[in-house]
Amino acid sequence: MIDIKSRVHCEAAMAKVTTAEAAAALIKDGMNIGVSGFTPSGYPKAVPLALAERAKTDPLKINLWTGASVGPEIDSALTNAGVVARRLPYQTNNDLRKAINNGSVQYTDLHLSHVAQMARYGFMYGRHDVDIAIIEACIIKDLGNGQIGIVPTTSMGNSSSWVQSAKQVIIEVNVTQPEALEGMHDSYVPLDPPNRLPIPLVKPEDRIGTAYIPCDLCKVAAIVPCDITDKVRSLGEIDDEAKAMGANLVAFFKQEVAERRLPKNLLPLQSGVGSVANAVINGLVNSDFEDLTVFTEVIQDGMFDLIDAGKLRVCSGTALSPSPDCLKKFYTNVENYKKYIVLRPQEVANSPELARRIGVIAMNTAIEVDIYGNVNSTHIAGTKLMNGIGGSGDYARNGYLTVFFTTSLAKGGAISSVVPFCSHVDHTEHDVDVIVSERGVADLRGLSPKERALVIIDKVANPKYQPLLKDYFERACKECGNSQTPHILSEALSFHDRFVKTGTMEK
């Protein structure tokens, strides 16, 4: 067994050290299991793998609650073993996505800031309690009086709330995670109504909690050594389209500063997950903007590049999700990066209250947008789940400025990312200020629906599809008598229908 004695500072806790197999045996059919992790960072690995192995001879089903997406040791292993009955609140795993879209796993797509409190409120489907929390740690501290402090690793996610709410806690002490991570975290769980108070954070750099998750030792059912690394993913190359979107964003920001709608160092930035979002942030590295602040959920390569360039003052998030190369860079210089980074529970990092208070600039990606400014972030052709809404809604409705990015084309030009009407709506026209593509910037603030349509078709849509979109809009205006939001109901989803039938949205 892996030696974790130097990581466990509480002598009484050492008596609870056991194998992954013994810990997995504690999990029973029908349980609600809350795990640490947010993106493939800071999630338990040994116990889920042992549970998947056990299920080969002892089948069972669990309801799996996470922070967001997690690594393959959970989502692939448990899905392929038939263990997952229900899953929430976000995922990016191919095996799990297939199971969701064929109906074998029931999936609840939630705003990420809502998850922990919904569990505490008893709003979840079926049985409401967290039966067992499985949390990855780099250190277990002795707080005295039968209390320990769980020092998380590369993410916070919902760990603080899971530990507080769970009947039992399993801790995986991962020796591949550096002990130097201690001090980066800020664990805080808000009170629930009717006793809720304002979250006492007014700047991205504020610390309002503890550097560990407090836990009663009597709750800890098992402590499991682990030496499996985070399965972080490589990000896509920054292509010409991504560079163009980044340049368009920087030009827009410069105009906003010139018009005195933004300060010279902008406002706290929030950026979604993925290659496009990372590429857009990377566009700021070579810009003139300095003394930037970040209040986001996921800290990707672009954020580290801003730190390295001396342009970032503080970076607040709930998870580190760098590429493998960037993770190595971080691990070799943890002490320096710690000066800039704060990891918080997603209930705080994604808090709508805080997004509005500090004036976040929300920047997220879209699968498609329609001519009136509605955004689809989650479904292909309105039916097949891609990933989930994630934290985009937490920030979009409550930020100072809300920006969505999309390339004008997808699938080699077979799909227009601008359509007459979104096949699924995650963010309504009321929540969208600006849409950016490689072609330009559509500033929708203060415009009527018909004005928005003209700007989006002109600035965002690809010339290949502009004639079709203009034709639809003009005929809709005539057919509806120039009404507030013109649509031809029999044709509103015609682009999608044509793609499903012919493989292209072109006529």
Segment roles from a protein language model:
Residues 2-507:
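Conserved alpha/beta enzyme-core scaffold
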